[in-house]
Amino acid sequence: MSKKKRRRCRRTPPLTAKDRHHICYQGRYWGSGYAKAIRNAFVRPVPVVWHRELHSRLSTVPVPDGALLKKAWVEYQKEADIIDSMGVCQAIAWLYVHIPDVEFRRAMQFQLDFFASKFEETVY
């Protein structure tokens, strides 16, 4: 019997690789009702390196009250086509405006600042 050759994986992904970022995470907290619907609606592609760095700095996004989530979901349904075409920063800003929970907004502000700084770095 011969030994199989193991495939070698890249330890660091190429800078052009994209990963799906759930703006509202972790899934175990955002797994039911309007929370799950909002989590699944707000997924945007981001570079893998940025995605890993963000998750190493911010471990979870707190789940707001169910009434706030329901109100935000109803607003999302009215403007779904427009919101789905938004980039990651615009989508985070939309969530920040429509869900007025203090802890949630703190996490959204952190993500917004993080992505804004990363996009500034790539422009130059």
What are these regions (language model features)?
Residues S2-Y124:
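Catalytic toxin/effector domains delivered as secreted proteins or via bacterial secretion systems
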